[in-house]
Structures are given as structure tokens and as C-alpha cells.
Regions:
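Hydrophobic alpha-helical bundle cores within soluble ligand-binding/oligomerization subdomains
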Residues: 1-219
Length: 219
């Protein structure tokens, strides 16, 4: 693909041969005890959050975690052998009609505030993704009724619970997994694709879905 081709700047993370994964200047080994909400703040702001900052992120996610019923109907209507990645991408696109960025752009939004609408969309989508991913798992693999989100829990514990596992050790494993996969630098297929699609002023629902299409490839 683009191996060795310099095509964009990424300041959120990098992998160094002698140091491993570095996220915002911090070695990943020093972040393994952090919650997803803390990692999100770190990626956005560039520094670790205070307790009040973490609580603010949790409240923001909780306020936008509800997933409309039509999305679950769409997932249930997909073929029984649909690939889970296809279902996740379809679920994200089923939310595109809620895009703040798209609405404000159509209303004549000024260029210098594009980032505000894009951030708002991103937060809303990220808040819903655990419930969408859990629904994909439970529908695709016939695990029974969907388990409603509990906005009072942190993201990793809530996701583990919606998958159907209440074991605290599993929730801790999910938290660690989310931390290790929090950022993909900028030059891999999925992240780069998201950048390219967003550069056409497509909203985050489109750009994230496009990135996942790249991630679904075998390479």
C-alpha cells in the first residue's frame, strides 16, 4: 500500500522500535490502568485529565449513549451470515441522519467552527458505539435479547456487561484492550481512509464507516 510514503502528520501516537507504542508522549505501559474516558481526554487534549475532567467526559458520553430502535431493526434485518464488521458499519451509517456537522454545514456553518461540529458528532458516535458493537455480537451470534446500556458505568464495564459478561476480570480485559487499540497512528489504511473521506467534508459518521471498511480488509 503506502509503506514508506509520507502523506500526513499524526501527533497522537507513534510506535518506536526501542520504546514500543507511545500515546501523546506517554509509553503505553504507563497507561494500562487508565479508563477509556481518560484515554479519550488524553488523545483530544494532549495531557492526562484531572478527576473533574474524567467525570465531564463520562457525563458527556452518558448523555448521548441512547441508540435509536431503528438501528437495531436494521441489524436484525441483515442476513444471518452477515459479517460482524458489515453490521457495525451499517449500524454507524444508520445514524448518519443525526449528524450535527451535516446539518450545520447545510445551514452555512463557518469554516473556523467545522471542528466543533465534527467533535460533537464524534462524541455522540463514540458514546453509542459500545451499544452498537454489543448488539452486533448478540444478534449475529444468537446470544438472546439485547442488554440495555447502563450510563452509570464506565465505558469498558458497560461494554462488557452489554456483551453479556459481568465478570470484573473480563471488564478489566476489555478496558486494557480498548487502551491498547485507542489510536492507530495516522498512516494505516483505516485511519488514513478516515482522514481522506473527512477531507471532503463528509461528516464523522461517513468517515468512521469508511475507515472501518478499510480495516475490514485482509491486509
Amino acid at each position: 500500500g503506502q509503506r514508506g510514503v509520507k502523506s500526513l502528520v499524526c501527533d497522537t501516537s507513534l510506535v518506536e522500535p526501542d520504546k514500543g507504542l507511545i500515546v501523546r508522549g506517554i509509553p503505553i505501559k504507563d497507561l494500562t490502568d487508565r479508563a477509556p474516558e481518560e484515554i479519550f481526554y488524553l488523545l483530544c487534549v494532549g495531557e492526562l485529565p484531572e478527576e473533574a475532567d474524567v467525570e465531564g467526559v463520562k457525563q458527556e458520553f452518558a448523555a448521548h449513549s441512547d441508540v435509536p430502535d431503528h438501528l437495531f431493526d436494521v441489524l436484525r434485518a441483515m442476513p444471518a451470515d452477515a459479517h460482524p464488521m458489515d453490521m457495525l458499519i451499517t449500524g454507524i451509517l444508520a445514524l448518519q441522519n443525526e449528524s450535527i456537522f451535516a446539518k450545520r454545514y447545510d445551514e452555512g456553518m463557518k469554516k473556523d467552527v467545522y471542528w466543533e461540529a465534527a467533535l460533537e458528532d464524534s462524541i455522540r458516535l463514540l458514546a453509542k458505539l459500545p451499544a452498537i458493537a454489543a448488539a452486533v455480537y448478540r444478534i449475529r451470534f444468537n446470544k438472546g435479547d439485547l442488554i440495555p446500556s447502563d450510563p452509570g458505568l464506565d465505558m469498558s464495564t458497560n461494554f462488557a456487561r452489554m456483551l453479556g459478561n459481568n465478570d470484573p476480570e473480563f471488564a478489566d480485559l476489555v478496558r486494557l484492550y480498548l487502551t491498547l487499540h485507542c489510536d492507530h497512528e495516522g498512516g494505516n489504511v483505516s485511519a488514513y481512509t478516515s482522514h481522506v473521506v473527512a477531507s471532503a467534508l463528509s461528516d464523522p459518521y461517513y468517515s468512521v464507516a469508511a475507515g472501518l471498511c478499510g480495516l475490514a480488509g485482509p491486509l
